[in-house]
Amino acid sequence: MYDVTIVMTIGKVFRFQTDEESKPNEYQFRHENNQLFWIPVGDDGIYLNPMHIVSAEFRVINKQNN
């Protein structure tokens, strides 16, 4: 699971959590190939242009087994 923070050039910050293990790799691929990157926002989601992203952090959240 990842705690994701994306900062845009206009100062807008998006924070969300995802359990998709491929999300960091997908972000890197889309950034390198200048393709839109989908993120969840509210009940739906939006596409971000990687040229407008200042930084993206994917921090691993350790799951605790009960």
Feature locations, PLM:
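A generic structural signal for beta-strand entry/edge sites
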Residues: 1-3, 36, 45
